[in-house]
């Protein structure tokens, strides 16, 4: 980790370049503090408190730093005991740390849509998932986001694993909403997003297909979507 930080901090800009530090977390699963709440004991797993220290150091050296989360943030480590509170630990932490994007993961849907919407309603950044739709046919969350670093425009496209349907529909956790196929939505989003200098996929998906289902892994998805070649 120290070598990675040193690498980031020692890079230098010149008149033809701009150094942008993109920092991302994923699968935090309720470990905001280095504490296992189910066992009520300290854990070496780490947590967002440790991440926060690294982020602060990098931001001090490079103001062109962006922090995002790629999904599975709110579930785990006994965080379900806070579901009916006015304030949920995850949103309090990510607001404090200055996360600009929260991508939805499959576990964000474990508690149902009403709970999820209530939790992210207190988030100050951009909640994203390009393949989540309401019954009226409109996207429930942002599918893409553009961040400006001076004259440079960085685009972010968001997708979640379509396996959410298999995990959550039978439980009734998607009531009133639909999760669509990632390949179809990626084609749409590539058409919709304005021209940018760089395009980054924020996908809560593995590299390879899940259960041998096509386009549930990023490698298969990008190979099959022709516009992704651009």
For each feature predicted by the language model, list its residue ranges.
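Acidic, metal/ion-coordinating pockets
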Residues: 1-230
């Amino acid at each position: 980790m120290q070598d990675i930080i040193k690498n980031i901090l020692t890079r230098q800009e010149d008149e033809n370049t701009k150094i942008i530090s993109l920092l991302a977390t994923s699968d935090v699963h309720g470990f905001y503090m280095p504490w296992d709440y189910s066992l009520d004991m300290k854990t070496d797993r780490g947590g967002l408190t440790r991440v926060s220290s690294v982020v602060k150091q990098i931001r001090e050296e490079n103001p062109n730093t962006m922090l995002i989360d790629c999904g599975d943030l709110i579930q785990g480590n006994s965080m379900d005991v806070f579901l009916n509170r006015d304030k949920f630990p995850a949103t309090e932490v990510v607001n404090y740390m200055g996360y600009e994007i929260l991508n939805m993961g499959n576990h964000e849907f474990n508690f149902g849509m009403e709970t999820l919407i209530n939790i992210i309603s207190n988030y100050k950044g951009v909640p994203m998932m390009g393949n989540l739709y309401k019954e009226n046919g409109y996207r429930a969350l942002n599918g893409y986001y553009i961040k400006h670093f001076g004259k440079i425009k960085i685009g972010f496209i968001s997708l979640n694993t379509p396996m959410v349907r298999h995990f959550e529909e039978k439980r009734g956790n998607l009531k009133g909403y639909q999760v669509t196929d990632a390949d179809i939505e990626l084609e749409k989003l590539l058409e919709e997003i304005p021209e940018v200098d760089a395009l980054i996929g924020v996908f809560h998906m593995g590299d390879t297909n899940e259960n041998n289902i096509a386009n549930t892994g990023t490698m298969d998805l990008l190979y099959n979507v022709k516009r992704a070649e651009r």
